[in-house]
A protein has these predicted regions:
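Glycine-rich beta-strand-centered segment in the early N-terminal region that forms part
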Residues: 20-34, 48-95, 134-136
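Short glycine-centered segments of the SAM/dcSAM-binding site in methyltransferase folds
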Residues: 82, 165, 255-256, 282
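NAD(P)H dinucleotide-binding glycine-rich loop of Rossmann-like/cofactor-binding domains
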Residues: 91-169
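Mid-domain Rossmann-like dinucleotide-binding core that forms the NAD(H)/NADP(H) cofactor-binding site
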Residues: 137-216, 221
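Glycine-rich cofactor phosphate-binding loops and adjacent beta1-alpha1 units
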Residues: 158, 205-280, 340
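Residues in the short beta-alpha loop(s) of Rossmann-like NAD(P)-binding domains
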Residues: 195-196, 263, 289
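C-terminal hydrophobic helical "lid"/dimerization subdomain
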Residues: 245-249, 290-341
């Protein structure tokens, strides 16, 4: 089968690989769509992403497709089913798993990180991690389920209430998803900070009340000018020290600051403890997607969440290397890989 194999920093090779074996509990999926994630970029750049990778490995953890075959112990799935996956497979036996925090599993299997993933024509996945797509969900939308599930976990930790004022920093795919989820959670005023005009325009179409150029405008002054009062929640979706510091600066009294964007492991931020104390800020973060996959699927299938407007292109495996290596390409939006192209 055709696959994109990661051999090390800046070394991704599109090559023929053996079709995966199907174990007793496995579902063999013919991959139709696999999203390119920021974690894939971190791995390609040699940084530590959300999981360790031991090359050679087929990357890709956001994918959907058609069931090709099932193992002898598999129940609930059959060839022809349209499915997507939750790529984070906990062991169920370690202390975190037994304590109900299995996203901190000590022996986590990660499809597309610790084992082969979806940047290939086929991937074999444990049945526990497979979900059927709704009738109204395309493969490209199904591939977006995992990032939506991650966003939901972050939203759950933000304490958003009806009437809340929320600022989202970053208008990439994650920021645009967060913005919509914030609206669904009941926030009445949602502001997006994003330097790229095209992304600000998409945000306004998706329901943002205000979109501010975060580089060329004085953000606090613009918020005041537009009558934005106390900011209850700030969700940082960029993963850069400067934007995390900005989030703390613009957060209002008793606000929650969600640090959602993935930084590099050695990066640091400068925080004035007195500012945190004076405003009674809650600084928090979220990690992957515990128990949120089903909710993500239902939001997408119901049409309550637009996961298509931020997609720049459905590309081929041969284009993946360029996408991972070129920030200008990624700035255009979300890329979905179709291994059959």
């Amino acid at each position: 089968m055709k696959s994109a194999v990661f051999y090390g920093k800046h070394d991704l090779r599109v090559e023929e690989s053996a079709k995966p074996a199907v174990g007793r509990r496995d579902v063999l999926i013919n991959v139709k769509a696999c999203g390119v994630c920021g974690t894939d970029v971190h791995i390609y750049e040699g940084d530590k992403g959300a999981a360790d990778v031991t090359p050679p490995t087929i990357l890709g953890h956001e994918f959907a497709g058609v069931v090709e075959a099932v193992g002898s112990d598999v129940a609930g799935f059959k060839p022809g089913d349209r499915v997507c996956i939750d790529p984070n497979h906990p062991c169920g036996c370690c202390e975190p798993c037994r304590d109900g925090i299995n996203h901190y599993c000590e022996h986590m299997t990660g499809y597309g990180t610790t084992v082969n993933g979806g940047f290939a024509e086929y991937c074999s996945v444990d049945m526990q991690q497979v979900y059927k797509l709704g009738d109204h969900t395309s493969f490209e939308q199904g591939a977006m389920t995992e990032p939506v599930a991650c966003c939901l976990h972050g939203i759950d930790m933000c304490n958003i209430k009806p009437g809340s004022t929320v600022v989202v920093i970053g208008g990439g795919m994650i920021g645009l998803l967060m913005m919509q989820l914030v609206k669904n959670a009941g926030a009445t005023k949602v502001v997006l900070l994003e330097p790229v005009e095209g992304k600000r325009e998409v945000a306004l179409k998706l329901g943002a009340d205000l979109a501010i150029d975060s580089i060329h405008e004085d953000v606090p002054a613009r918020l005041k000018q537009e009558g934005v009062g106390n900011v209850d929640v700030v969700i940082e979706c960029v993963g850069k020290p400067v934007t995390i510091e900005q989030a703390i600066q613009i957060a209002g009294h008793k606000a929650t600051v969600m640090m959602f964007g993935l930084t590099k492991p050695d990066e640091t931020i400068t925080v004035k403890p007195f500012e945190v104390f004076q405003k009674e800020l809650v600084l928090t973060s979220s990690y992957i997607n515990p128990y949120t996959q089903r909710r993500a699927l239902e939001l997408i299938d119901s049409g309550r969440l637009d996961v298509s407007s931020m997609v720049a292109k459905v590309a081929s495996l041969d284009e993946l290397g360029a996408i991972l290596s070129d920030p200008a390409l990624r700035a255009m939006g979300k890329y979905i890989i179709d291994p059959s192209k």
